[in-house]
C-alpha cells in the first residue's frame, strides 16, 4: 500500500489481488518485470555510490588535511609562538601522576636490586678472651659490623658507632685482657657526612714523607663571624679518595699524649687510619698547636693497628675524626676533616664550630628502625680508661648522597621527564589538530548533503524498501536491538565512554558534571524521537511490526 492509493468501496486488498492475477495472465508480463529489475538495480547502485561519497569522502579529506595541512601549522604555532606544554589541566595532572609513579618504581627497583640495603640484625663474632696482639687478626669481624649507614626518604643518614676500650699502649695489647664490643650510639645527620672544627683547636698531621698541614678554610668560611657554623666539604666522596666497599676507619684517642698534665694545652688527641686498597699508613705522627701557634708533635711515632702488607703510602690522604662530649650529657659531637694533595691552600681554622651528628630522638622512625633490626645485647669491658678504640666501617659502600640511588638516577629521571614533556606536548598538538580536521570533515559532509539531494532521496527510498521487505519478526528484532543499545538499561556506561573519548579527542577539559548531564539527556532525546517515528510512520506502514515489537518488549 502506498499513500497515493485511493480509498473506494472495494477493499484495497481485493484490488491488489485482482491486479496480480491480471499481470499473471497477461501475455506481456516479462516486460514490466524487466523494468522493475532495472529500476531496482539502478536504485541499488545509486544508493551505494551515494553512501560511499557521503561517508568516505569527508573521512579521507579529514585524514589528508590533518596530516599535511593542520598538523604542520599547529606544530609551528604551538612550539614557536608560545611556551605552554599542556593544553588543559587534565593533561598536566596525568603527566605529574606518571612522574610520581616512575619515581616510586625507580625507588622500588633500587630497593630490590641493592644488596643489604635494609639488612637484618647484623651478625658479628668476637672471641671473649683474645690473646695479646690478636686484635689485628679480628679486623674482618670488627670492620664488617661496626658502622651501618641507611637512607630514608626524610633526607637523613643514620650512623651506628661501636666503641671499645683496651688496656694497653696506643695500639698494643698487654696483660691478655679481654676485648668486647662496648657501648652503642645512634646518630643521624641531615646530610650524610659533614665536618666540624672544634673551637680554638687546630689539628695537624705529619706523614712519613715529612709533609704536614692544617685543615683549609674556604673563602666563605673566612667571612663567618665568631661562633657561626661552616661546612668544609659537603659529602664524603669529595675527599681526595672515597670509601670503597668493606673499607673501614680505625679511630683511637689517648689522653695527655706528649703534653704535661695540668697545662692549658692538655687535650685528648683523636686519630684513625683509613685502609684503602688493602693498605694503611706505615707511620703517622700526631700533634697539636700550642698557644704560640707552634706545632708540637707527639713524643712517639704511632704505628697503625692494621697490618701493613700491601700498604700504599697514603699519608697525604689522612683523615681525622674529632670527638667531644657535650656539657657532660653523654651526647657525642663528631666531626671529619681532611688534608691531602687535592685540598685547597692550607689555612688556619679557629673559632669555628660545626655540628653534623645529632642524637636520634626516641620517637624518630630511624631509631625505631634501628631498635627493630640492629638492637643487640652488647657486653662491656673495662681495662683502663686511658686508651679507647673506635671502629667505623662502610661495609655496603652505599652512596652517601641522601636519597640518591646511583650516579645515573638524575640523568634517567631527567630523560623520563623530557619524554613525558614531549609526549604531552604532542598530545596537545594532536587535540588541536583533531578539532580543526574534524570541523573540516563536518563542513565537507554538510556540503555533500546539500548538493546530493536527489541521490540521497533515492538512497533513503532504497533503505526503506529494504527494511520493509523483511518479515515482521526480523524488523521487530532489529528495532529492539537498536533501542537497547542506544537507550537501554546499560546504555549510560557506553555513552559515558563515548563522551569521554570525544572530550579527550578534542582536548577539552573533562568536566564530569557536563558528561553526566549529556549521558542523562541525550539517550532520552533519542528514545523520544524513536517512539515518535513508531507512532507517526511505522504504525501506518506496518502495524504488524509494531504489534510484534511491543510483544517482544513486554
UniProtKB/Swiss-Prot annotation:
Keyword entries, A-Z: Antiport, Chloroplast, Hydrogen ion transport, Ion transport, Membrane, Plastid, Plastid inner membrane, Potassium, Potassium transport, Transmembrane, Transmembrane helix, Transport
Q: Which reaction does it catalyse?
A: K(+)(in) + H(+)(out) = K(+)(out) + H(+)(in)
Per UniProt, what is the membrane topology? Answer: Multi-pass membrane protein
Positions of transmembrane segments = 50-70, 429-449, 479-499, 514-534
Which domain of life does the UniProt lineage start with? Eukaryota
**A Pfam family of this chain:** CemA
Q: Give the main location.
A: plastid
**Entry keyword Transport:** yes
Instruction: Please give the residue ranges the record annotates as the region Insert.
Output: 113-410
**Function, as annotated:** Contributes to K(+)/H(+) antiport activity by supporting proton efflux to control proton extrusion and homeostasis in chloroplasts in a light-dependent manner to modulate photosynthesis. Prevents excessive induction of non-photochemical quenching (NPQ) under continuous-light conditions. Indirectly promotes efficient inorganic carbon uptake into chloroplasts.
By what name is this protein known?
A: Potassium/proton antiporter CemA
State the organism of origin. Stigeoclonium helveticum
Q: Which lineage ranks, top first, belong to the organism behind this chain?
A: Eukaryota, Viridiplantae, Chlorophyta, core chlorophytes, Chlorophyceae
Amino acid at each position: 500500500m502506498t499513500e497515493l492509493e485511493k480509498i473506494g468501496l472495494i477493499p484495497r486488498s481485493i484490488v491488489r489481488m485482482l491486479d496480480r492475477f491480471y499481470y499473471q495472465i497477461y501475455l506481456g508480463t516479462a516486460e514490466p518485470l524487466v523494468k522493475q529489475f532495472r529500476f531496482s538495480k539502478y536504485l541499488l547502485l545509486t544508493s551505494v555510490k551515494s553512501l560511499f561519497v557521503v561517508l568516505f569522502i569527508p573521512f579521507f579529506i579529514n585524514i589528508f588535511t590533518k596530516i599535511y595541512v593542520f598538523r604542520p601549522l599547529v606544530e609551528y604555532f604551538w612550539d614557536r609562538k608560545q611556551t605552554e606544554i599542556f593544553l588543559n589541566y587534565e593533561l598536566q595532572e596525568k603527566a605529574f601522576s606518571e612522574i610520581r609513579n616512575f619515581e616510586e618504581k625507580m625507588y622500588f627497583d633500587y630497593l630490590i636490586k641493592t644488596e643489604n640495603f635494609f639488612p637484618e640484625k647484623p651478625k658479628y663474632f668476637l672471641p671473649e678472651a683474645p690473646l695479646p696482639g690478636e686484635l689485628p687478626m679480628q679486623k674482618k669481624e670488627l670492620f664488617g659490623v661496626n658502622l651501618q649507614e641507611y637512607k630514608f626518604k626524610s633526607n637523613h643518614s643514620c650512623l651506628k658507632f661501636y666503641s671499645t676500650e683496651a688496656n694497653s699502649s696506643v695500639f698494643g695489647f698487654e696483660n691478655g685482657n679481654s676485648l668486647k664490643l662496648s657501648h652503642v650510639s645512634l646518630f643521624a645527620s641531615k646530610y650524610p657526612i659533614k665536618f666540624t672544627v672544634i673551637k680554638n683547636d687546630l689539628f695537624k698531621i705529619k706523614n712519613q714523607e715529612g709533609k704536614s698541614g692544617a685543615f683549609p678554610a674556604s673563602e666563605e668560611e673566612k667571612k663567618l663571624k665568631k661562633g657561626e657554623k661552616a661546612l668544609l666539604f659537603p659529602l664524603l666522596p669529595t675527599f681526595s679518595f672515597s670509601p670503597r666497599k668493606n673499607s673501614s676507619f680505625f679511630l683511637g684517642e689517648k689522653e695527655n699524649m706528649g703534653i704535661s698534665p695540668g697545662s692549658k694545652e692538655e687535650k685528648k688527641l683523636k686519630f684513625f687510619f683509613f685502609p684503602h686498597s688493602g693498605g694503611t699508613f706505615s707511620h703517622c705522627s700526631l700533634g697539636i698547636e700550642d698557644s704560640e701557634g707552634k706545632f708540637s708533635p707527639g713524643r712517639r711515632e704511632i704505628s697503625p693497628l692494621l697490618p701493613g702488607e700491601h700498604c700504599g703510602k697514603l699519608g697525604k690522604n689522612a683523615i681525622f675524626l674529632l670527638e667531644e662530649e657535650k656539657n657532660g650529657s653523654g651526647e657525642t659531637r663528631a666531626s671529619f676533616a681532611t688534608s691531602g694533595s687535592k685540598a685547597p691552600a692550607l689555612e688556619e681554622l679557629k673559632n669555628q664550630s660545626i655540628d653534623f651528628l645529632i642524637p636520634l630522638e626516641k620517637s624518630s622512625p630511624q631509631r625505631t628502625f634501628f631498635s627493630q633490626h640492629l638492637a643487640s645485647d652488647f657486653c662491656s669491658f673495662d681495662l683502663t680508661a686511658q686508651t679507647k678504640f673506635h671502629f667505623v666501617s662502610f661495609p655496603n659502600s652505599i652512596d652517601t648522597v641522601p636519597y640518591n640511588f646511583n650516579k645515573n638516577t638524575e640523568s634517567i629521571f631527567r630523560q623520563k621527564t623530557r619524554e613525558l614533556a614531549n609526549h604531552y606536548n604532542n598530545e596537545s598538538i594532536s587535540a588541536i589538530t583533531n578539532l580543526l580536521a574534524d570541523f573540516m570533515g563536518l563542513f565537507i559532509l554538510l556540503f555533500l548533503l546539500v548538493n546530493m539531494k536527489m541521490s540521497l532521496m533515492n538512497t533513503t527510498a532504497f533503505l526503506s524498501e529494504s527494511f520493509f521487505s523483511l518479515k515482521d519478526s526480523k524488523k521487530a528484532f532489529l528495532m529492539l536491538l537498536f533501542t537497547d543499545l542506544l537507550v537501554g538499561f546499560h546504555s549510560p556506561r557506553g555513552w559515558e565512554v563515548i563522551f569521554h573519548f570525544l572530550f579527550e579527542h578534542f582536548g577539552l577539559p573533562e568536566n564530569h558534571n557536563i558528561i553526566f548531564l549529556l549521558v542523562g539527556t541525550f539517550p532520552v532525546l533519542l528514545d523520544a524521537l524513536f517512539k515518535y517515528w513508531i507512532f507517526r510512520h511505522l504504525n501506518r506502514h506496518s502495524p504488524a511490526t509494531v504489534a510484534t515489537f511491543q510483544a517482544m518488549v513486554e
